[in-house]
């Protein structure tokens, strides 16, 4: 089965072709980071307009690179939600328009399911069941995954997501956009003993997260500086911030594995690319005797490959999941634990 995947939920336009026999045939991605940089964040209207400009050239690129004819695809999977409404509509319109033109069925995919399954694209994918930490700019969730569509929520953020805390704290330190990579790079030069920031909900009796207080703590430290913050102070604060986030995420993952008795941990989402987090989880895995799986770095960010793959997995379970129904039906808000209804 050959599936075309289309991702357009936020500020990356991604297209990919995935074949259940041959694997990932081609994928192409365009990031709008440079365009949004001057605004300090994603501008939804600009994002939507840029998806329109990029989608068709990227579509032609993946067909050209794969050597596959347009009519050879069996289905089209697109990100149906959650995400920015206008951005989602662009991907949906491309999918439905192409499906109508080629007489191919289409299937809406949950963006977070795409992230959740992206580590399965690796050469040594994890087996079910496993614990998944989904950690990105908009979401921080711990889930038990027993199979495709079999997701049990164990814990989630009660306020800011980890990635959101990264971006906002980076802005407080004047590190620019995107904040996550910037604050992580700065943290590498920081003194881990210079500042001590709180570890929100580290010792709570559940698996939920809360990062708004950590962001506020960074703001307090910045405001308490009597002079302009020098680069070393920024690095020290960044280090304290990253250490706090990483410690909480690692501890919650270890607790989830202990409570469920599982020995496999999957990390998905953009924050999963953070080197400090990977080092911490790898150390915990060696100490606690579990195995941790990550997506390839190129698949940590939003991408079309994960959508094509998720679509292919869905269709293997239920070949009738894709329909020749070309009405747009995007879901800007869409809880992950409801997608088994697809």
From Swiss-Prot:
Fe cation binds at residues 111, 115, 302. Its EC number is 2.3.1.234. The gene is tsaD. Pfam families: TsaD. It catalyses: L-threonylcarbamoyladenylate + adenosine(37) in tRNA = N(6)-L-threonylcarbamoyladenosine(37) in tRNA + AMP + H(+). GO terms for biological process: tRNA threonylcarbamoyladenosine modification. Belongs to the KAE1 / TsaD family. It is found in: Cytoplasm. It comes from the Bacteria. Its cofactor is Fe(2+). Keywords: Acyltransferase, Cytoplasm, Iron, Metal-binding, Transferase, tRNA processing. Substrate binds at residues 134-138, 167, 180, 274. The lineage of its organism: Bacteria, Pseudomonadati, Pseudomonadota, Betaproteobacteria, Burkholderiales. This is tRNA N6-adenosine threonylcarbamoyltransferase. GO terms for cellular component: cytoplasm. GO terms for molecular function: iron ion binding; N(6)-L-threonylcarbamoyladenine synthase activity. Required for the formation of a threonylcarbamoyl group on adenosine at position 37 (t(6)A37) in tRNAs that read codons beginning with adenine. Is involved in the transfer of the threonylcarbamoyl moiety of threonylcarbamoyl-AMP (TC-AMP) to the N6 group of A37, together with TsaE and TsaB. TsaD likely plays a direct catalytic role in this reaction. Binds 1 Fe(2+) ion per subunit.
């Amino acid at each position: 089965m050959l599936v075309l995947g289309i991702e357009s939920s936020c500020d990356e336009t991604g297209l990919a072709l995935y074949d259940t026999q041959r694997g990932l045939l081609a994928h192409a991605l365009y990031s709008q980071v440079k365009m949004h940089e001057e605004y300090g964040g994603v501008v939804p209207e600009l994002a939507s307009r840029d998806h329109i400009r990029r989608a068709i050239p990227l579509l032609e690129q993946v067909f050209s690179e794969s050597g596959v004819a347009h009519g050879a695809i069996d289905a089209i999977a697109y990100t149906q939600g959650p995400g920015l409404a206008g951005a989602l509509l662009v991907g949906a319109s491309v999918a439905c328009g192409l499906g109508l033109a080629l007489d191919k069925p289409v299937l809406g995919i949950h963006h977070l399911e795409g992230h959740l399954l992206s580590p399965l694209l690796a050469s040594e994918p994890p087996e079910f069941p496993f614990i998944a930490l989904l950690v990105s700019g908009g979401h921080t969730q711990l889930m038990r995954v027993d199979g495709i569509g079999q997701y049990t929520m164990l814990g989630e953020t009660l306020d800011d997501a980890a990635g959101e805390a990264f971006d906002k704290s980076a802005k407080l330190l004047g590190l620019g956009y995107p904040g996550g990579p910037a604050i992580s790079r700065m943290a590498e030069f920081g003194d881990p003993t210079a500042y001590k920031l709180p570890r929100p909900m580290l010792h709570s009796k559940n698996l939920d997260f809360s990062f708004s207080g950590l962001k506020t703590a960074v703001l307090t430290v910045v405001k308490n500086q009597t002079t302009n913050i020098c680069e070393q102070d920024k690095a020290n604060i960044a280090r304290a911030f990253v250490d706090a986030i990483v410690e909480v995420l690692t501890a919650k993952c270890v607790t989830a594995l202990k409570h469920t008795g599982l020995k496999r941990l999957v990390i998905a989402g953009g924050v999963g690319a953070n080197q400090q987090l990977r080092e911490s989880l790898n150390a915990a895995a060696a100490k606690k005797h579990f195995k941790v799986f990550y997506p390839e770095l190129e698949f940590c960010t939003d991408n079309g490959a994960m959508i094509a793959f998720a679509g292919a997995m869905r269709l293997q379970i239920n070949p009738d999941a894709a329909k020749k129904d070309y009405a747009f039906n995007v879901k800007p808000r869409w809880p992950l634990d409801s997608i088994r209804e697809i």
